[in-house]
A protein has these predicted regions:
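Alpha-helical transmembrane segments
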Residues: 299-311, 345-346, 373-378
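Non-cytosolic membrane-interface motifs at loop->transmembrane helix junctions
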Residues: 136-147, 172-176, 205-213, 272-283, ...
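Extramembrane terminal tails and long inter-domain/linker segments of multi-pass membrane proteins
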Residues: 1-30, 61-64, 301-308
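Helix-boundary and loop/linker segments of multi-pass membrane transporters
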Residues: 26, 71-73, 307-310, 349
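Hydrophobic, small-residue-rich membrane helices and short re-entrant helix-turn-helix hairpins
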Residues: 169-174, 206-210, 237-248, 275-276, ...
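Hydrophobic cores of alpha-helical transmembrane segments in multi-pass integral membrane proteins
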Residues: 30-56, 69-103, 108-132, 144-164, ...
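N-terminal juxtamembrane segment and adjoining first transmembrane helix
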Residues: 19-35, 167-175
């Protein structure tokens, strides 16, 4: 294990970052995860095209059992979730946390080992899912042995990240660090529930647990990881400090305490208790709090008088700029005079989404993961 000595840092956009120098951050783990994630994204994208073709030509590849819809669809879902999104999130966490802590990654060897195990997991998922070995639960299709490997890899990832944070140079933690720590803890809870607790029950109880997992896989795994990426790269790319760190923390704790309880909305008017439906309706209104907080952050951040140069700088980074514009549009937190601008931005976002053959939400999520490539040279 390489010595984890503190490195000299400076502030870029109010975010501590290492001063350029030889071998400050090796980023070997980062490259392994991000390259793998991009590769899986392209491969699974081809799987998605095959599935889409089956809706037009139902007999397309229908004589080959490995390419039937019932096997291809779980491969596409799990490939995008674990191969692309979660793999990219882990790679970006390995990039962001050491820089926010002012130290090197606690163990580059452990990180590389985690990456190797993660690739073994993805390849095992391809073989088992195409072979018809699956549990038949949404987002939890992976056979139990493969799911156990996911747990082991996540423990390795969590140990490395938390050990890096424990040796940090700065006492106060930036909001991205909070979101990434939350992602690690929430993922452990959510994944164990969806992949193991569901096997201990049947019927309505199993369905309720499964949709709790499915719902929170989006809200407590990919959402906080995406927010961590945005809170890090947007201020850094624009070289402008975050508008209000306390506001971002309000969004963090709102997500932590509210989102987990609303998973049953997938079963509204279904065979679940009425009190559960009533309570989740009450809590669901607060799910918007993190988004509104983030949107207000970006709006205030973007409207500062000193931000004209930073806006031009952001405009030169397409994916960061689209992330800012998308957050404005989706949060609905823009001031009334900016409605005309928001409409133009919405049209731009919609045209980009149509060009990519998907919806704006997924486009935003993918752009957030690609931002590292465009902002690394800023």
């Amino acid at each position: 294990m390489a010595p984890n000595t503190a490195v000299e840092v400076q502030s870029v956009g109010g975010i501590p970052t290492a001063v350029a120098g030889p071998d400050v951050h090796r980023d070997i783990t980062v490259k392994w995860f991000l390259l793998g994630a991009v590769g899986y994204f392209l491969i699974v994208g081809i799987v998605a095209l095959i599935i889409a073709a089956k809706f037009v030509w139902p007999d397309f590849l229908g004589s080959i059992q490995y390419f039937t819809y019932g096997r291809m669809r779980p491969l596409h879902v799990n490939g995008m979730l674990f191969g692309w999104l979660l793999g990219a999130d882990m790679g970006l966490a390995y990039y962001i946390v050491p820089r926010l802590c002012g130290v090197r990654l606690w163990s580059e060897k452990l990180g590389v080992a985690t990456s190797i195990l993660w690739n073994i997991i993805i390849l095992s998922a391809v073989v088992t899912l195409l072979g018809g070995y699956q549990k038949g639960l949404e987002y939890a299709d992976l056979p139990t042995p493969v799911a156990i490997l996911v747990v082991i890899a996540w423990v390795m990832f969590g140990v490395n990240i938390f050990a890096t944070i424990a040796t940090r140079k700065y006492k106060q933690m930036y909001v991205s660090t909070w979101y990434l720590m939350g992602t690690i803890l929430w993922t452990a809870f959510v994944y164990l529930t969806g992949n193991f607790a569901t096997l201990l029950t049947t019927g309505v109880n199993q369905a309720n647990l499964n949709w709790m997992y499915t719902h929170n896989a989006v809200g407590l795994i990919f959402t906080p990881a995406g927010l961590a990426v945005g809170y890090y790269f947007i201020p850094r790319a624009s070289n402008t400090p975050l508008y209000n760190h306390k506001l971002s923390m309000i969004g963090f704790w709102s997500l932590a305490f509210v989102y987990v309880w609303t998973g049953a909305h997938h079963m509204l008017h279904g065979p679940i208790s009425q009190w559960l439906q009533t309570n989740l309706d009450r809590l669901f209104g607060h799910v918007a709090d993190p988004g509104l907080g983030g949107g207000l952050q970006l709006h205030r951040h973007h409207e500062r008088p000193v931000a004209s140069v930073q806006r031009q700088r952001l405009a030169q980074v397409p994916d960061v700029g689209n992330g800012v514009l998308s957050a404005h549009v989706l949060s609905g937190s823009d001031a009334q005079p900016a409605l005309g601008e928001r409409d133009r931005l919405q049209d731009r976002l919609d045209s980009r989404a149509r060009a990519h053959g998907g919806d704006g939400h997924l486009l935003i999520h993918c752009h957030g993961r690609r931002v590292l490539c465009d902002s690394a040279n800023l």
